[in-house]
Amino acid sequence: MPDETMPGGRPSHVVVIGAGWAGWGAAKALCEAGIRVTLIDGMPDPTGSQPITTKSGKPFEAGTRGFWKDYPNINALTDELGAGDIFTDFTTSAFWSPDGLEATAPVFGETPQWPSPLGQMVATFTNFTRLPIQDRLSIAGLLYAMLDLYRSDKIFQQYDDLDAQSLFVKLGISDRLINEFLHPTVLVGLFKPPEELSAAVTMELLYYYALAHQDSFDVRWIKSKSIAEHLFAPLSRRLISRHHLQVMGGTLVRRVKVSPDSLRVSSVELMNVETKSVQVIEDVDAVVMAVGAKGLKSLMAQSPELSKAAPELVGAASLGSIDVVSARLWLDRYVPIAYPANVFSRFESLKGSGGTFFMLDQLHKDAQQALWGNEQPQGSVVASDFYNASAIAAMSDQEIIDRLTRDLLPASHRPSRIQQCQGC
């Protein structure tokens, strides 16, 4: 972190690349520390002031994000911005397979409070509709492994060297519990199947979201408009007006130049997405790279001095990236889906991806008109996200729509296929 002022009395200047959660978080912290900040992103309007819309004028947001109960930073931000009542109540989530309803995740805060994990076990005892109790009890070995994880650095490394699928099998977890619950949970939580994930990282996810505290898994959602409009837009206005934040949308960073003598950032080269014009910011003291591996790889390839000075960034840029596909459907009738937040499980048509879908007409029940833009509301609005979605991304828009409407979504609208498990 540079000093607040540089020699000569000018304020330190930091360029933040990327206007996602990480980029806005960095910009906020730096601005409030008295540092001049330029925030750069390829989106035309990273501030959220201009909502993203489809060609027909309907609102769209890339991905549906949940807000867990243990998000004190988000709660503090909404209070600080005076955002008001922007969230739904905490909601039940459901898991659906080709056989119908598999399980539901209750609102744990509404159940009797017991020490973890006893409280979670009691609260979910009747929430699996098809999975026999003997399969559910097979998860006991995983609870021991999670307690063992931090016993020493050596033990942690052993788990980190093992993939999660191998750990599940080694611990004797039943195939049904793995395939029908753990596998889809991990796919939508860490965006990769368990055979491609570190066992240590997977256990950290499960601990934080499900076992740390009984109600840590409780989740709620934005109940109108979008996250960008409710949070990023007021945050950007505050940082611009109070701290003179400069936001450059529709702009890509082509190169970060580093002085070979001092190994300090000397300039940042930019390109306008629309005009292809190039400009250089000379008075840069530091750069925050709030970008993914794909963007970082491109940037490092064009920044030889930086690559030489920071080989760890080259290593980070070599990591794989994850394809995510988001779709939103406006239906011509209301579909009575039992739960607003849902996870797909065991569908062959997912082609190895994880999938979720959300009934926005239920989550935004008091803001129906806003979901339809300038049109009269006609029916349900469904938002669906696919993770680890390379195969889905290669499909046409119509193919994705057909998979949702003909295969995936109908499974959650066939009550006759929801069977209560005998002996559960």
Identify what each model region corresponds to:
Residues G9, A33, I222-K223, T251-V382, ...:
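Mid-domain catalytic core of redox enzymes
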Residues N75, D79-E80, G84-A199:
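Mobile amphipathic helical/loop "lid" adjacent to a hydrophobic cofactor/ligand pocket
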Residues G141-R264, V273:
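Active-site/ligand-binding neighborhood in enzyme catalytic cores
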